[in-house]
Amino acid sequence: LDSKNSLEDSVTAMESLIQQGVDGISVFPISTEQGSQLVKMANEAGIPVTIENFAMDGLDDPGDYIASVACEYDKIGEAAIKWIAEQDPEAKIFFCAGQEGAGVYEKYQEGVDRALEELGGDVKVVATLHADWLTDKAYNVTTDLINSGTEFNYIFANNDMMAQGCYNALKDAGKENIPIVSTGGSPDGFKMLQDGIEAANMTAPVSIQGVKTFMNLYNKVALGEDPAEKFTALPVIPVSADDTSSYIAWDDYAAAYKYLGENK
């Protein structure tokens, strides 16, 4: 049931599932607080419930849920900087960042900072500019940075839409040879790898998230088995334009299931 990112609709959907007497429920909340409310509704009805897209352990009382599966954005940021460092141990990186204030960019920044500290100073982020997840704004901030004379030889873009904007700006300035590293592994991102727009993508396949969430629910409801871990982080799988064989598409559930079987 699609709650359309609405708390009210999600409560209505949960009430409908409870009235139908389903054996188990998987919840994709829009916040941990909303997730906790829905979990507690399932608890009151005696229906097992599992969570995806958020780690719930930060709440004092999240309710009783089977497990949660979610992306850890700091690990993606860390992986991006380390991948760049492997290509160029003295890289000068422009971080085209997402929007401040919602917590997502901030987690990426934690990972970037952690990687830079671990690498010891030879790799540098020479500029961090916020393009707020938008292609046009990424074009503008990249163009402004080029015009400022700041030297950089790698771009870490916080998503594929911004990576496209960065590339457009580089191309207009005759600098399209500067590699761009992005995140997410979306279908658009995969095409950008194939087209040479991105040098690499730090993928975190949502198909793995969906399959792992289903496995958690099925194993509990059908087999009575609890998962070994209460929280599972999505793996960060670096995919380069030179070798896309490790890419797992967002809708390739067979590949996701195979990956989980091989990486227990």
How would you describe each model-predicted region?
Residues 32, 37-75, 186-194, 199, ...:
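Flexible loop/hinge segments that line or gate small-molecule binding clefts
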Residues 11-15, 19, 23-44, 112, ...:
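Hydrophobic alpha-helical
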Residues 10, 67-93, 107, 137-139, ...:
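Hydrophobic alpha-helical segments within soluble ligand-binding/sensing domains
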Residues 1-3, 94-95, 116-135:
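Short beta-strand elements in bilobed, periplasmic/extracellular small-molecule ligand-binding domains
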Residues 24, 29, 66-67, 92-101:
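Short beta-strand segments enriched in small/hydrophobic residues
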Residues 29-30, 54, 97, 159, ...:
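Short secondary-structure boundary segments
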Residues 76-80, 103-123, 137, 141, ...:
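Short, solvent-exposed amphipathic alpha-helices that sit
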Residues 96, 100, 104, 115-119, ...:
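Hinge/cleft segment of the Venus flytrap/periplasmic-binding protein
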